[in-house]
């Protein structure tokens, strides 16, 4: 967990970076941007709460690959509302996947968006921030954010582009036929048209915690359109609410396939399979028609699913 490595098609390690020597521990994601820098989701090994308790999954570092040095670092506790925490009763269903004081954010995805940083925190939302650490916007239920964050919280729109005014939909206490927030989400993707594709795990949707086998739960692949000027978010398309067999409380991923404009929906754990056991799915969908082009059951849990070309670009 302390190293990030670059590996070639033959499985040979081309180069690696020792994060422990820099004071960090790797988790979830590392990407190389067009600027040639390495952006890594990390835990800072000496980061603590005011109580002295360790905190995890709430830092990002940028590394110069050739020098192996940190060019910039961000502490998400200085960007997001680290006080937005609700203690989870350990006796509640699904509590093992829930928020803890030390794991208040559970940052699980990071990538460049131009010169900005685009990220996901499982318990806080999908968000974009600038290099100076200033927030641009947040896609998240509005409940429990401190007032100083209100200007960053995107306002939901219905399918016709009208602002949703129902306070319970805005807070996340109920869903609308036209809109729902992402819950416990993973792997947000920037689409070529500037929209965002997200795996909405549906964990504790509307703040209701359940055992993962309990009926009525679902995960979705969802496409959002963000208007940065007017600070709004519109749900363009989604799939999964009709597939309770694809509910995944954690892990999982989505992918946009530019060659066909199809998408991959990859719920990675706890799915009820046709043989009565549990595992995951890989499903390719045409969003224009909602046609399932390909579907496969995986008889074990998995972190993410990604379609790769047979050979790297340029070969």
Enumerate the language-model features and the residues they cover:
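Histidine-/acidic-rich catalytic cores in large beta-rich domains
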Residues: 1-315
